[in-house]
Amino acid sequence: PKPSSAASDVYKRQLQGYVTGAARMPFEEQMDRMTAYVRKINDWALCDSPCSGFKFVRKHREEVWAFLQPYLYSGEVFSQRFAVVMLLAHFVTDDFIDRVLEACAAVRPSGYYASMAVAWAVSVCFAKYPEKTRPLLAGGRLDDETQNKAIQKIVDSFRVAEWDKSWVRTLRRPKERKS
């Protein structure tokens, strides 16, 4: 069966993201195309897979880090998700881990999908850099929803030791009761 026009539009937009990441072109053109692509993201699937394919970022981390900052603090859920997914895909490295953790602490997610991206990023940071990530989790800088989802992702991870999982469980926050 032929896909619906809405599904076809999603596939076309996702393909634009993949092409932007894979095509050989000058860095400035890739950045222009990435900027145009961010405006089209209105779904997690349009964000997550294409972002991980933006391999050109690894040769231009400082420039891309600066480019992502307005998106992190934009207050727009999918712009925030884009920026956070870019951080976890390309910046969880020895050189950037401290900045990534600070960004995760400072961003105020504007909706569920942004919050889940921050939780995912924190869990990836913990799996790779547990000692550096502990202060963020213990310090109360994440909102309750993001904190608890990060903890759940860490506990579910196969890359985290059992004793770390036990420690992380102690940091769960009670859910607010709805009246």
What function would you assign to each model-found segment?
Residues P1-A7, Y11:
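Single conserved hydrophobic/aromatic residue that forms the stacking wall/gate
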Residues S5, M25-A36, K59-P70, D94-A106, ...:
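Amphipathic alpha-helical scaffolding segments comprising HEAT/armadillo-like alpha-solenoid repeats
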Residues Q14-M25, L46-K59, R81-V92, M116-A127, ...:
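Structural detector for internal amphipathic alpha-helices that build alpha-solenoid repeat scaffolds
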Residues E29-A83:
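Hydrophobic, well-structured mid-protein blocks that either form specific transmembrane helices
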Residues D43-A45, V77-F78, Y112-Y113, D144-N148:
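Alpha-helix N-cap/helix-start positions at coil->helix boundaries
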Residues Y73-R108:
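A mid-sequence, solvent-exposed acidic-amphipathic segment
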Residues P109-D143:
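Glycine/small-residue-rich hydrophobic helix-like segments
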Residues P135-S179:
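Eukaryotic acidic, Ser/Thr-rich intrinsically disordered low-complexity regions
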